[in-house]
From Swiss-Prot:
GO terms for molecular function: chromatin binding; enzyme binding; methylated histone binding. It is found in: Nucleus. It comes from the Eukaryota. GO terms for cellular component: heterochromatin; nucleus; pericentric heterochromatin. Residues 1-27, 87-115 are annotated as: Disordered. This is Chromobox protein homolog hpl-1. The gene is hpl-1. InterPro entries: Chromo-like_dom_sf (IPR016197), Chromo/chromo_shadow_dom (IPR000953), Chromo_dom_subgr (IPR017984), Chromo_domain (IPR023780), Chromo_shadow_dom (IPR008251), Chromodomain_CS (IPR023779), Heterochromatin_chromo-domain (IPR051219). PROSITE patterns: CHROMO_1, CHROMO_2. It comes from Caenorhabditis elegans. The keyword Ribonucleoprotein does not apply.
Amino acid sequence: MSRQNPVRSTRGNSLRAREAQQAQDAPLFQESSSNVFVVEKVLNKRLTRGGSEYYIKWQGFPESECSWEPIENLQCDRMIQEYEKEAAKRTTRKRRYSPQPSTSSSAELQPSTSDEWAGKTLKTIIGITKAPGELHFLCKFSDDSVHLIPLREANVRFPSQVIKFYETRLVLQGVSPTIPGGMS
């Protein structure tokens, strides 16, 4: 079922009857040569190659008559500004996507005390972050628990895994690899 724009619609008498009724109710919004419709609400926005379009709910028309309109066809700057302000509020409230699974729904991961992970076997170092003033490794242990370990402690307790972590992420710029045997 396609939705048609009431501005461009030529469906028949029922739409024309509604237009005639609107002309009687609001003569200021009706011109003799062309129809001007009243915007009830701006519902959505999309970007197209031609520019911005807004999804409009027309006053006096059902939800099924909503349509996408280019900004050039609209004369409701205040409503568009209000919609943009509300849309900006909605986007700032959204949380950013993190590929790492969340370990706590309400609080960030806090640095662990050594008794929480003492005696556990380190499975992998996931990442590194600067938590309250110093660097911490985000470590996953064999029991699938995740803890923030201070850099100094990780260097002492898990030196080989720390080196392996750095080696997998180290990128040298401006250094050409040499091939053993004299060729470079």
